[in-house]
Amino acid sequence: MFERNQKTIFVLDHTRYFSIASEEYISMDFLKGKPSADGGATGAAGNASGGGGSQFSKSLWTCACESSIEYCRVVWDLFPGKKHVRFIVSDTAAHIVNTWSPSTQNMSHVMNAMVMVGVPSRNVPTSSDYSVIHGLRAAIEALAEPTDEQLAAMADLGTDELPRIPNKGRVICITSARDNTSMKSLEDIFNTVLVQQNALAAPPAKKGLVIDHCHLVILNIVPLGVESLVTNRSLLKISPLLDVEIHTVSAPDISYKLTHLILNHYDLASTTVTNIPMKEEQNANSSANYDVEILHSRRAHSITCGPDFSLPTSIKQGATYETVTLKWCTPRGCGSADLQPCLGQFLVTPVDVTSRPSSCLINFLLNGRSVLLEMPRKTGSKATSHMLSARGGEIFVHSLCITRSCMDEAPSITDGPGGRVSDYRTAELGQLIKMSRMLPLKVKDPSAPPLTRRLPRYFPLTTSSSILFHLQRHISWLPHFLHLLVKEDMDKQDEVRCQQHIHELYKSASRGDVLPFTHTNGARLKLSKAKDQYRLLYRELEQLIQLNATTMHHKNLLESLQSLRAAYGDAPLKSEPGASLLRSYTESPLSPERLEPNSSGSASGSSNSNSLLKASKRRMSSCGQRSLLDIISSAERSQSNKRLDFSGRLCTPLGQVAKLYPDFGNKDKDTVASGASITPNVKEESVRS
């Protein structure tokens, strides 16, 4: 609730040094005169070279005041009444500009107070009494003061639970130091005062709230063109209570630096609306395109973009942060079908509130108009991702849904990889989930079946991959029969009923009745003979009973079915115990690995079915008889048998050394043209057993 950005305190250095010019000169144009030769803002070098018009330069104090007040304006525009900003001016003492009270948390109060403070005087003699340390001490004391929200929380919790109130804050100090040593001294003093303040806030004194953590940001500003001896430093943890970061920036660029910092301090994002058509100020008959930069919550972009969209970003001249570029969309009439759902709305404030393009855009929105913003996709097309509109005198950015909406129809499961599959057993899967629901018990029941027994044993995902579950829609007694097979507490009466149903299947097979298939979903169930259909049915039924055979009644059913299969001429082969469990519980005799679509015609359907059945039975029976080591060893032996072994190993007795080149060096020396003697080079290799 009480985050670190809820309390922010600006400490402004009001010493004599801040009365000097920032060295960024601005030309003055008069209505009846001509503009200066420089034609705008120039630097110190341009001023030295001379110019035809009048120029002036802001002081360091003016640059610091304008940028800090603009910082708090953005905070109060985007978080009205939720985030608090205070100002403290430091010279010979600390001057409190405003408090945590809502009556002083507004632009009018702060600006009137800053006018009364004024620019530091250059005629004041240099003295050690003028220091920014006075303001830093007052800032720590201000952090210990509770806000109205903290007071309300303390009233709810009671006085005995005050340490439970979180109290964090941030101090932004705008000053100017000589070197890193002076900056290090400033950090040490701040850390010491922070520890002392927490000691005063602890019992029994209880003077204010304990400061849990403080983030100190020091901005070391210098005139334009002046190099500073203070080194920039990223966020560094000084103590468990204090984090410090240091930035050295020229006075004209301090506004860009504070805008960059506020993005991280309050989790904001910058958006630049480009190509805004606007009439020229001096020529009403022509128009030009302008850009306006706005600030808002970062979530306005994060909740809109999906994986198929990218945010186009750019960096403004003079700035160091990125801004998202969105294009002005020309208003056009659209029906309800063209409107996207809104994912969220967030307050908006312009970066430069006094510029003419910002003023025109604000007035356009406050008059009841809305603006759609476009963003390009990766493919090059554009999508309307945001909308600007105003309500109640406040401007909002609406994040529009550019991906699939929750109100859209869900994508069909048949559109996934692997082609269209339309016979998923969705309803049966839901019933299975309800039946398999487990609840924790305080006391373990010793008579309860083990956990693995209650898990689903066999569940084909599609109807076309199973004969047994495909027929339950057409044979009336089959659903009840399947329910009895998976019962955990099957009794003798259930066993008798199942025996009767199994004998009915045997009688139907003896009469040659064709199983009632109405929907085959391809060619998987297109078997030319009823005998092949019953064989597959018996095999799947045996697999189902075998996976659930935990009671004596299940085992009796399994033996009865196996005897019927033997009488039918389809006796199962003996296999190792548990070998069938190596197959997936979602596979069936009609899975693609077991039975492929028959494309050879009806004449060869019977032979192909028989061969597939035999191959499937061989795979199921041989599964588990060979280990992975046996398979790899067999492959290595088959490869080694294709090559002849080294003759030295074959001809040399075990334990002796074989010569690698036995005939090398035995040729007549006369045959050598050079007549030089050849030294035999004999290499030996030991024979490994």
From Swiss-Prot:
Residues 521-550 form a coiled coil. Keywords: Cell cycle, Cell division, Coiled coil, Cytoplasm, Developmental protein, Differentiation, Meiosis, Mitosis, Nucleus, Phosphoprotein, Spermatogenesis. A motif (Nuclear localization signal (NLS)) lies at residues 613-619. Its main location: nucleus. One of its GO terms (biological process) is dorsal appendage formation. One of its GO terms (cellular component) is cytoplasm. It is found in: Nucleus; Cytoplasm; Cytoplasm, Perinuclear region. Belongs to the multiprotein complex Integrator, at least composed of IntS1, IntS2, IntS3, IntS4, omd/IntS5, IntS6, defl/IntS7, IntS8, IntS9, IntS10, IntS11, IntS12, asun/IntS13, IntS14 and IntS15. The core complex associates with protein phosphatase 2A subunits mts/PP2A and Pp2A-29B, to form the Integrator-PP2A (INTAC) complex. This is Protein asunder. The lineage of its organism: Eukaryota, Metazoa, Ecdysozoa, Arthropoda, Hexapoda.
